[in-house]
Amino acid sequence: MIIAIDGPAASGKGTLARRLAAHFGLPHLDTGLLYRATARALLDHGHDLSDREAAISAARSLALTDFDEAGLRSRDMAEAASVVAAIPEVRAALVDMQRRFAGRPGGALLDGRDIGTVICPDADCKIFVTASDEARATRRALELRGRGEKVDYAAVLEDIRKRDLRDSSRAAAPLKPADDAVVLDTTKLDVEAAFKAALVIVESAHDSLRAGHPAF
């Protein structure tokens, strides 16, 4: 079974993805890390984030083992990832890697921004996780403070809105729900309630798959 989870920053999709992957025993790929690692490689080699050729080269050279996940979770790296993700050739360079991961025997779970629309358009289950701007900013601020970063809520909210605009308006694979995705609004849900809601969606898709019918 292939599960695609998409959504904007701090919507809760990453937490849901990890919980669901563990529950169903599926390998999990946070595809956002690919773009963060690409941006990190650019900066480490002294390139500007707007250097298209360097960004494309970094993406093509990336391997799934190139992740120092803790070092990629900062607010700065999130912003940098959004910049390089807007380069169509970078996205194209990373598509095959993501599809190979999704094609593993037994299935996989991928989360990102274009899994259900571009990477795995035929996924067995698609969930688009969203929440209000304010709820997402609150979550992101708490997350960053938990890592010891000094955070201003207003600045985090502004960053999220800018990133939403960039992600949804880019020419290549803009952020949007797949036509057959189930939208899950987590604004008023805690982690456990969101997980239970997502579990119902996935189990419904799984039951439909076993019955030989389209998931939705």
From Swiss-Prot:
Q: Name one GO cellular component term.
A: cytoplasm
**Ligand binding (ATP):** G7, P8, A9, A10, S11, G12, K13, G14, T15
Using the UniProt record, give the first listed, main subcellular location.
cytoplasm
What are the GO MF terms of this UniProt record? ATP binding; CMP kinase activity; dCMP kinase activity
What InterPro entries does its record include? Cytidylate_kin, Cytidylate_kinase_dom, P-loop_NTPase
Which EC number(s) does the record attach to this protein? Answer: 2.7.4.25
The alphabetical list of record keywords is:
ATP-binding, Cytoplasm, Kinase, Nucleotide-binding, Transferase
In its UniProt record, which GO terms are filed under biological process?
A: pyrimidine nucleotide metabolic process
Q: Which reaction does it catalyse?
A: CMP + ATP = CDP + ADP; dCMP + ATP = dCDP + ADP
Kindly indicate whether the keyword Cytoplasm belongs to this entry: yes
SUPFAM superfamilies from the entry? P-loop containing nucleoside triphosphate hydrolases
- List, alphabetically, the Gene3D superfamilies matched: P-loop containing nucleotide triphosphate hydrolases
Q: Where, per UniProt, does this protein localize? A: Cytoplasm
Q: Tell me the protein family, please.
A: Belongs to the cytidylate kinase family. Type 1 subfamily.
**This protein is called what?**
Cytidylate kinase
This chain's source organism reads Methylocella silvestris (strain DSM 15510 / CIP 108128 / LMG 27833 / NCIMB 13906 / BL2)
Organism taxonomic ancestry: Bacteria, Pseudomonadati, Pseudomonadota, Alphaproteobacteria, Hyphomicrobiales
